[in-house]
């Protein structure tokens, strides 16, 4: 059901500092987190004083104040021009899986650890955010994955992932058997603890920890990374982003298998199931302050060496 906002758009000729780029801004954050709450309150006050219409995601609205417009994440996607996510990369991933289906720009304020997807500093966001709101920003289109579980020829469950879809055992780690097909062409059979199918966005996350290569965000590619394969010759492989990945689970496996999407959503998998992982039709419109340098982010977050000369 739609919502009617009395201050959703500025009147022509009104006295405001707003640019024509963004008018209605959604605030999303990590619930029950003291640092996030402080930043959300500052953001809400600052944006309101600038003349913007501000909507606050319902899980954090009460922490921001009783005077806020509280809405769910879908309403932020449908009604806002810009979403600001306060938290870590995990919070950004959760919001992005929903917001990617809408025509909305997304930017992050880092209240987490690494913060590959959250650029703005929590204590001094005003200067950088002011320039973004004036239209000075860089845009990246990040594609998502769609993971499907098929059983006896029928679709049983599905979900989307920004980072990765992972086939793995349930609560107890053990080796599983499965076959891997790329565009219906058999690639290999595998005995391993699982398989990671990652986007370029996810290549600095779980995939990296499992020995996968880093893919720059603009690459139209996916990377498949076996988890603890029972062979010395099996290595990660990069395939075209339009490829359709099929994992066929051996009927001899135990019944406690899952497919995890970004580590947040788990799809149950039974022996004999087929998992299809493909590019989603949804795309996340991630924006950064002007001059954003991906390699500077990598160097800073991963502790790479600085320039020697």
Swiss-Prot record:
Keywords, comma-separated and alphabetical: ATP-binding, Cytoplasm, Kinase, NAD, NADP, Nucleotide-binding, Transferase
Location of the active site: 89
Cofactor (UniProt): a divalent metal cation
Reaction equation(s) it catalyzes: NAD(+) + ATP = ADP + NADP(+) + H(+)
Highest taxon of source: Bacteria
GO biological process per UniProt: NAD metabolic process; NADP biosynthetic process
Record InterPro entries: ATP-NAD_kinase_N, ATP-NAD_kinase_PpnK-typ_C, NAD/diacylglycerol_kinase_sf, NADK
GO molecular function, one term: NAD+ kinase activity
Any single GO CC term annotated in Swiss-Prot or TrEMBL for this entry: cytoplasm
Location in or out of the cell: Cytoplasm
PANTHER family linked to this entry: NAD KINASE
HAMAP family (UniProt xref): NAD_kinase (MF_00361)
Function: Involved in the regulation of the intracellular balance of NAD and NADP, and is a key enzyme in the biosynthesis of NADP. Catalyzes specifically the phosphorylation on 2'-hydroxyl of the adenosine moiety of NAD to yield NADP.
Name this protein carries in UniProt: NAD kinase
Organism expressing this protein natively: Shewanella piezotolerans (strain WP3 / JCM 13877)
Taxonomic lineage from the root: Bacteria, Pseudomonadati, Pseudomonadota, Gammaproteobacteria, Alteromonadales
Gene name in the database record: nadK
């Amino acid at each position: 059901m739609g919502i009617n906002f009395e201050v959703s758009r500025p009147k022509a000729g009104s006295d405001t500092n707003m640019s024509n780029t963004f008018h209605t801004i959604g605030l999303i954050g990590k619930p029950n987190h003291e640092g996030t709450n402080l930043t959300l309150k500052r953001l809400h006050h600052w944006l309101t004083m600038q003349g913007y219409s501000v909507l606050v995601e319902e899980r954090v609205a009460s922490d921001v104040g009783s005077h806020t417009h509280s809405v769910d994440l879908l309403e932020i996607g449908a009604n806002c021009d810009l979403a600001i996510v306060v938290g870590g990369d995990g919070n950004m991933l959760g919001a992005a899986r929903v917001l990617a289906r809408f025509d909305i720009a997304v930017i992050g304020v880092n209240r987490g650890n690494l913060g590959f997807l959250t650029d703005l500093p929590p204590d001094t966001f005003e200067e950088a955010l002011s320039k973004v709101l004036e239209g000075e920003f860089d845009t990246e289109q990040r594609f998502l994955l769609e993971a499907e579980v098929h059983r006896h020829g029928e679709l049983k469950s599905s979900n989307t992932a920004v980072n990765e879809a992972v086939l793995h055992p349930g609560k107890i780690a053990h080796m599983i058997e499965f076959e891997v097909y790329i565009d219906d062409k058999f690639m290999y059979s595998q005995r391993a603890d699982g398989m990671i199918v990652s986007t370029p966005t996810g290549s600095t996350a779980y995939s990296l920890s499992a020995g996968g290569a880093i893919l720059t965000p603009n690459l139209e590619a996916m990377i498949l990374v076996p988890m603890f394969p029972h062979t010395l010759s099996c290595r990660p492989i990069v395939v075209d982003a339009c490829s359709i990945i099929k994992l066929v689970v051996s009927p001899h496996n135990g019944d406690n298998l899952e497919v995890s999407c970004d580590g947040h959503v788990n799809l149950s998998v039974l022996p004999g199931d087929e998992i299809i992982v493909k590019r989603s039709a949804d795309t996340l419109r991630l924006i950064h302050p002007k001059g954003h340098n991906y390699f500077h982010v990598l160097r800073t977050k991963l502790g790479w060496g600085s320039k020697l000369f």
